[in-house]
């Protein structure tokens, strides 16, 4: 019996973050929960790092409701080491380094179950890998819905965060010219990613037209800042606009709201390695936190202007990776 298999047998409780009522970051607590075990097609990983996403603090506040009751666990983006596999799993083995999306939204924990996963690219450590899954899937899905490809000019509203930063680089890799909105402080960062920056806020549309007098072919709204009418005008109609953040505005202006219910793009997890190894993709991690500081991580994610991602580092010694870097 190897060490990973032994670890999975002797443990029966894990540390995990959860909330028992809706509210601010203070409702989060670290509790002991029974170890999960994978079903058919699933794997279990010892979580080394877990990303923080806006969806998680919106669920915590009660702004989103996916039908789960209370208490709720939290966390979707995870990276770690496989320590148990379910029936029918042949693509990974115990000891492999993987990243992906927690099946039950319980990634901020010592153990997590995954169906959608991929090997961590060789040059990435766990922290950088944990920043990627949701941003990759969401950005890829949105670009696919807009048919972004070579020569298709794209405007992204809200570009400096994790999804926006990811969408810029994926669009540029497809050969699309990109204009991105962000604060002036982030303009150099957007140029580094490959986008032409414009400042958001009043007069944004006029500033975009100085770069694209005839408008753009497509527009992606990541920020949900009430600019859908301007994006529709710049992109030549609502059919050329997708929003990730303005559900009510999408209904009002007949714009597509992309939520993932229409289909996922988890194939992006397996495809990103080539761009990373070629030096064509990079998603910065602005800050890391230990699991017991998840409340502060949520506070910064909710109220701060984060460039890239925030990531929890899980102090796990359940298994050690058999291959690849250990960062």
Model-assigned labels for residue ranges:
Residues 204-214:
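Short amphipathic alpha-helix with an adjacent loop that forms part of the alpha/beta core around
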Residues 132-201:
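Mid-domain Rossmann-like dinucleotide-binding core that forms the NAD(H)/NADP(H) cofactor-binding site
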Residues 303-308:
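Glycine/proline-rich active-site loop of Rossmann-fold NAD(P)-dependent oxidoreductases
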Residues 100-158:
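NAD(P)H dinucleotide-binding glycine-rich loop of Rossmann-like/cofactor-binding domains
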Residues 96-97, 111, 153, 173, ...:
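Residue-level marker of beta-strand positions
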Residues 34-51, 63-105:
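Glycine-rich beta-strand-centered segment in the early N-terminal region that forms part
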Residues 191, 222-284, 291, 313-327:
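Glycine-rich phosphate-binding loop and adjacent beta-alpha segment
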